[in-house]
Amino acid sequence: MSGTGFRYGLNVMKKKKPNESSNRITFTEDDSSSSEQEHAPIPNSFSSQITAASDASKDDNYDASIYGFDEFYDSMKSAEREQMELKRLESKDRRPKYMENLIESAKKRKRDLLLARERALLKKNELEGDDATEKFVTSSYKKHREEVQKAIEDRKEEDEKSITDTTTGMKDFYASMLDRQEKIHQAAVEGVQNSKKTGAEIGDAMKGQDTLGSDNLILEAKKKGLKLELNDNNEIVDQRQILTAGLNIRKSSANNSMRDDKKRNHKSSYKRSLSPSTRYHQDRPDKRHGTYSLEEIDKQRKEFENRQRLQKEKEFQKSREAALKIHASRNTTETQVQSARERYLQRKKKAATNP
């Protein structure tokens, strides 16, 4: 156990002795160099060089303003003080919100009251005569009357203008709405007419250039700004002309027309081969999905009732005949029994008389 180096209890590690070479004072040939070179740290490894370089880069990227709390606080408060100063100036020049309107309306009422009094006074003077108008009239009063007369004329002009400017309610609303719809409709009609014109011009150009291929025509039209394409029948059409007013029915090709002619001829020849009655019934219009008149409805109702009545009569006749047959068969057996009984009695009587 002593040879292994372990002991019972705590295994206390021995402290390493300090390097004596580092503490020794040596004198070399570089003692005459400057003090900065003597105290400069000498990197011992590559990792220490990297850490030194990273510390230098951090020092270069260091922003001294990140700790400027006082400057930031002062700038923030200065902005707040400026805002408060602006509000104070605005509040100094601020007036009551509705006071100006109230003052203006009060002046207007006062002017209207003055005009009403002047009108009443003029009417009174007219009733009294011309002499009464010249009594106790001064130059200032004449000037005042001129101002009042001018105010009355201005008021009349304002009333007339307000009457002409004011709308008549729903009438003007509907009139403006109809005018707007009419303008939209007119613009749509003009657009359709323009598209038809362009389509006709394209058709004329296509007829005049039959020798060129469809691809060349489409390329030329695209250069001109038109939008063309080939439809299912290999016809060149304008995209604006595809959906025009009315039903958008495509033109049937020549093959379809020939096929329809063949079907029509075959149908006509088949009808000619039929009898007149069959042809009449086939040519009658099919009214299963159509409309009927009252006379036709009444006629059909009567025919249905007659068919029902005849069917009931036939059923009653059949049931009656079956009952008669059963009854007749029963009567026949009774007569046969009666005749047999009579013959039996006769034979018995004969036997009694001839022992």
Swiss-Prot record:
Alphabetical UniProt keywords: Coiled coil
Residue ranges, compositional bias (Basic residues): 346-355
Region described as Disordered: spans on this chain: 1-57, 253-292, 325-355
Any one biological process term the GO annotation gives: regulation of alternative mRNA splicing, via spliceosome
GO molecular function: mRNA binding
Cellular component annotations (GO), alphabetically ordered: nucleus; ribonucleoprotein complex
Skewed-composition ranges (Basic and acidic residues): 280-289
Pfam families listed in its UniProt record: NSRP1_N (PF09745)
Top-level taxon of origin: Eukaryota
Bias (Polar residues) ranges: 44-54, 329-339
Positions in coiled-coil regions: 99-162, 293-326
PANTHER family on file: NUCLEAR SPECKLE SPLICING REGULATORY PROTEIN 1 HOMOLOG (PTHR47845:SF1)
Family assignment from sequence similarity: Belongs to the NSRP1 family.
Name of the protein in its database record: Nuclear speckle splicing regulatory protein 1 homolog
